Amino acid sequence: MITEVFFRNFYRNYAKFDVVSVERREFAFQPFGGGMVRHKSFNSVDELRRYIVEKTPKHIYHSVAYYERPGEEDMDRKGWLGADLVFDIDGDHLNTEACKGSAVVSLRCLEDAKEETNKLIDILVRELDLRPTRIVFSGNRGFHIHITSEEVLKLGTKERREVVNFIKGVGFDPSRFEVKLGRRRVKLYEEEPVGSLLRVRQAVENPDTLRVEIDEVVTQDIHRLIRLPGSLNGKTGLVAMPLELKDLERGVENIVERAIAFRKGNLKFRFEKPLIGEVLFEKIEARAGDLKILPAHVAIYLELQEFGKIYD
């Protein structure tokens, strides 16, 4: 499979994995042929890289948790030591016009996901005094936020659920406020307000501004697997790329451009489905059965999205 060859070459020559405490993490891999290989452990990033080059998986994940025995298959015997606090924002879960029914990665949908990520970071920093350790473009439609500080490592599922509720504004009731907002008055919240006064006041006018659409299961699961930063997303062929805060101040086209792994060469691609639109900056107009020569990164993306097949 040509796509697998491209993946192997990337991992052998270009990949830079961004993960700490490798020896305490469980790793999991989804091969190109399907299935899932779990409970793998490695003593170093170099050992991890050698395994990845040899096996060339389609997807690569690591545990948010740290374990005494990460390679143990019995979860009760792994020896849980703590877990990062991780947030996942996915365009698929956003109820915006740009994100509804998009067959391919849409820059407009990704822009919406980026704005949701900025909103999340603002709440984490200003209201919870939690600073992201790592911000990662998922390589598809969203972003992952990792917090690895000591204060979050021992949080259990219940405490993480409370963080989720806070961020999603669960239980917020505008009728419990009484503040003068223009010509209207509402009741003042008599208990501890949800978040900052600014966020609460905005939410009185529009409750949707209070909520951040995170995947709550990801955040509260202390054994969760998350995509390895620096690896390739097997749905797109784009790099799950670590970012800096300043990257979120720019247009998402800059992020996507930097995440393109396969920049050289063209490939023949036979469409099995019709497609009209823009794919990774390339305008496409094709009917089922059409054979086109496309940039390698576009052809690989389309094959992974099951729009057709790459031909020698």
Curated annotation (Swiss-Prot):
GO terms for cellular component: DNA-directed RNA polymerase complex; primosome complex. Its cofactor is Mg(2+); Mn(2+). One of its GO terms (molecular function) is metal ion binding. Keywords: DNA replication, DNA-directed RNA polymerase, Magnesium, Manganese, Metal-binding, Nucleotidyltransferase, Primosome, Transcription, Transferase. InterPro entries: DNA_primase_S (IPR002755), DNA_primase_ssu_euk/arc (IPR014052), DNA_primase_ssu_PriS (IPR023639). The keyword Magnesium applies. One of its GO terms (biological process) is DNA replication, synthesis of primer. The keyword Nucleotidyltransferase applies. The active site is at D88, D90, D215. Its EC number is 2.7.7.-. Pfam families: DNA_primase_S. It comes from the Archaea. HAMAP family: DNA_primase_sml_arc. Belongs to the eukaryotic-type primase small subunit family. Catalytic subunit of DNA primase, an RNA polymerase that catalyzes the synthesis of short RNA molecules used as primers for DNA polymerase during DNA replication. The small subunit contains the primase catalytic core and has DNA synthesis activity on its own. Binding to the large subunit stabilizes and modulates the activity, increasing the rate of DNA synthesis while decreasing the length of the DNA fragments, and conferring RNA synthesis capability. The DNA polymerase activity may enable DNA primase to also catalyze primer extension after primer synthesis. May also play a role in DNA repair. Heterodimer of a small subunit (PriS) and a large subunit (PriL). This is DNA primase small subunit PriS. It comes from Pyrobaculum arsenaticum (strain DSM 13514 / JCM 11321 / PZ6). The gene is priS.
